[in-house]
From Swiss-Prot:
Keywords from the UniProt entry: Membrane, Transmembrane, Transmembrane helix
Gene: HIGD2B
GO cellular component terms, semicolon-separated: membrane; mitochondrion
Transmembrane segments: 47-67, 82-102
Subcellular location: Membrane
Keyword hit for Transmembrane: yes
Domain HIG1: 20-106
Cytoplasmic side: 1-46, 103-106
Protein name, entry field: HIG1 domain family member 2B
InterPro entries assigned: Hypoxia_induced_domain (IPR007667), RCF1 (IPR050355)
Residue spans, topological domain Extracellular: 68-81
Domain of life the protein comes from: Eukaryota
Source organism: Homo sapiens (Human)
GO terms classed as biological process: mitochondrial respirasome assembly
Pfam family, one: HIG_1_N
Amino acid sequence: MATLGFVTPEAPFESSKPPIFEGLSPTVYSNPEGFKEKFLRKTRENPVVPIGFLCTAAVLTNGLYCFHQGNSQCSRLMMHTQIAAQGFTIAAILLGLAATAMKSPP
């Protein structure tokens, strides 16, 4: 019967350095781009998505207001409009992804 024992590593582990694997060189990825810069860049690349998001939020807010006022017909209309706005936003995201995938790399 084999006994279990501790395995001693060849070199001591240092938490400040990444492990070294054969054929893999670790790189540190640093992105100086902040949230604002990334948001503006993504908005310039695909401006339809933020428009769809704002339309969805506006319709949702108006629907909640109609619901709070007790206007069920307006509230129901806003629910249907919200679904259409969400579909528009999803379609814009998918078309943006397709356009990015088809764009040739520089």
